[in-house]
């Protein structure tokens, strides 16, 4: 799942994302490797601690972030929050929370973009496009697998923000060509 809807009202849309099963499995696998190396080695206690802490460090580094997106029409802002356990441990609890605040009126479009994920193939993410030409992803990492989950979140945001795409001139001409001719237009 890309993001879960925490709350949805006419003025507020709150989306959340937590590390997925793949991320937690990787954490358990790497950490158990360190524990097994420490348990089965004949090394001193210092080396055993090094094995465990080294693998814990690598495991936490590979853990995905917790992410939130809060769209609030009453304040006119969207708040994108990210919490990283790795940054929290690395900076000794001083950092780990990143936050981006943007005005809702600046959002022009919501798109789904494809991103290449090293070793695994393709991933998808929602990208917010702003009036300034700047774009920002809704989450920091792409989700693997079904594009439909990501498209559903993009449609939810688009409908909440009431962003309706205007037809381009070429789309208008194509739709008028496909319409049946009126009674006076037949030859």
Swiss-Prot record:
Q: What membrane topology is given?
A: Single-pass membrane protein
Membrane-spanning segments: 20-42
- Keyword Repeat carried by entry: no
InterPro entries per record: Cybc1
Extract the ranges annotated as region (Disordered): 167-187
- One record GO biological process: innate immune response
Q: Which domain of life is it from?
A: Eukaryota
Q: What's this chain's function? A: Functions as a chaperone necessary for a stable expression of the CYBA and CYBB subunits of the cytochrome b-245 heterodimer. Controls the phagocyte respiratory burst and is essential for innate immunity.
Its name, as the record gives it, is Cytochrome b-245 chaperone 1
Gene it is expressed from: Cybc1
